[in-house]
Amino acid sequence: VLIHLRKPRGGRRAAALAAAVAMAAAAGCSSASSAKQDESKPLEVWIRQDAGSPAAESAEALTKAFTKKTGIKAKLVAVGVTDFETKLQQRTAQKNLPDIVINDTGQLGNLVTQGLVREVDRKGVVGGNEIVDRAWEAAQGFDGKYYAVPFNSQAFALLVRKDWRAKVGAEIPKTWNDLTKLAVKFTKDDPDGNGKDDTAGMVIPGTTTRGYLTWWFSTMLWSEGGDFVTKKGDGYVPAINEPASVKAVKKLQGMFCDSKVVQPGASTADSATTHTVFESGKGGIYLTGPYMLPRFDASLGKDKYEVIAAPPGAGGRAALAEGENVYLMAGSANEKSQQKFAEFAASPAGQKIGLGVDNGGIIVRLPVNIKVDGTAERRDPRWEVFQKVYDNAGRNAPNLPNWSNFRQISSEGFNGVVSDCSRDVDQAMDELADEFDAELKKQGAKAE
């Protein structure tokens, strides 16, 4: 599951209006005392998965196991990936939220800002001390309080065509510059041996839609020592126009404009497109998550590609870390059972069901519970690469009131310099920093 973000620039004002409407609508269900408590009331559990999918089957198994263990009735609703946000806003307007929502860590700011979730007492969560700290960080709001219980984590690594690397006689890249050189070879040296100029070294989802370009570029930006914003006192200041950040963006622009190692149409490609590019043999290096392994094993062949950690840059080794949380929605008539569900989902029993070992429905990529060894359960050492990346280099998005706005704004800024090769990066990043500054003020997160 990829990040679920806001619409591109054209829809930002409309999205903001929708959020304001949602906030007003949620006011009636944001108070803990607004719903009379009834511990016999069944839980309604939402997950952002398509009905009938293996992932939905795993979520159904999780829900049934919870009921079997606790005696608490719960009904799973697999809400389609494409209309999840719409349906949630409809229920918000009706002041009738589901009890539980399993959704991205990146949505925490949106949900908190709109008053749709209630606070969680980390110390009061049974088994909470077994949940890794980095996962808890992704459940923490800008105010330092927790608004969810972690359920799933993931980090991103490089899938590299192993057979192509052997064909061009290249070593595993040790730096981002090495990675670019490998991408050049994959682009120019006919690694598939078909005699045609039809391969790309780097597969990049560069569209602004849902903030994909920022999602991809975060790992590279941080590795090169850059950042989006910098913590200063109780707030943040823009860092995207600092020298290290600008240097990283220039390298990104170079991939599109100088070495030209990206696939055709990269600046408008989303993940559905890039998945196809990689598995169809048209691209050689793809930064993505472990959830893609089953698909690529089946379509491309397990022997054709390898999993390696993204190399360190000038700033060391870093990789975007994400995941899903169990959100305890506001206005529930059964708050005690809400928390029990979240505790079960994060427990070893819940985590093992989420691994989807039996049915391939992977809703837990990397376990958040220290007592579960995902690699051992799956018996696939490639997952250990992702686990080590998460443990040693994983980095959550900045803890802002609403990070998704910054993700969208930055994606548009980055796309501007890769879509127009004549665009001056220094100037573009100064302009982006100004946008960040305005957004920080708007969110009340600007450092004094």
Language model features: what each stretch is:
Residues L2, K73, A166, N392-E448:
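Conserved C-terminal helix/tail region of periplasmic/extracytoplasmic solute-binding proteins
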Residues L2-N110, R122-N129, S267, A314, ...:
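Conserved N-terminal structural module of periplasmic/extracytoplasmic solute-binding proteins
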Residues R91, P98-D99, G128-W164, T175, ...:
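A structural signal for short loop-to-beta-strand junctions that line the ligand-binding cleft
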Residues T105-A157, D198, L213-W216, M220, ...:
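Hinge/lid segment of periplasmic solute-binding proteins
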Residues D143, Y147-F151, F156, T180-V237, ...:
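Extracytoplasmic/periplasmic solute-binding protein
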